[in-house]
Amino acid sequence: METIINPRILLLLLSSVIMALVIMFVPPVSQDPGYHNFADQRNISGIPHFWNVVTNIPFLVLGITGFFKIQKQELTGILPDFFRAYLAFFMGLVLTGLGSGYYHLDPSNLALVGDRMAITVTFMSFFVLIFGESISTRTASRLLLPLLFLGLASVVYWNITENLGTGDLRFYALVQFLPMLLIPLMLLFYGSCLSGRRWILAIILVYVVAKIAEMYDQQIYELIGFSGHSLKHLIAAFGAFLFLKGVEVRKPIK
């Protein structure tokens, strides 16, 4: 698992380069002001946008639970070399719960900065963990801090460009969606040094369903009285729950 001298790595590199080039040649995309106009605007118990706020609580619970379980170092489904990456993932969940909850109290570009920073911490940590169990633990452990920096930098860059009146989401889009392209490729072309790969496959599927729910925010709200965006929070939290269960039951492959 420690070597990446394999022709299949070229597919990952080529995919990364192609997507980066595509993003580079796409005109800058600013944040749509309508993005903040979510379907469920209800104020309940004095809390504005109640369900979009409180559906972030599972992220807090799962993040705190996972953080302390990882610190005990009693879980079988973790790679010892990646202790910091697991901690970063679960801390990212905690920050996502806080950042998203705060954002939904009064949605704005400024509040969205913290939300997106937290999400990038979770995304980059998850990507590093999958890279490590699939390709190279040594290389992945070296990637954690640079990728976290790039993720946070993408949000800072977007915020600066928005403040300058020339909003540019391209860098952030690359950071968010490139891992979602590369992870399935790693699952398809590489094995794992941990058992139970189906846990990761389930997490990817759940993430896709969550994004679909987000896309149909208004339609789902009109259909069931509960918005697609709030449902997205719960579905994504279920994905985090699957990850936590995975690190409890997966085992190293000798």
Segments predicted by a language model, with ranges:
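Early transmembrane hairpin module of multi-pass membrane proteins
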Residues: E2-L147, A153-G165, F189, L194-I253
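Extracellular-loop-to-transmembrane junctions of the mid-late helices
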Residues: W158-M186
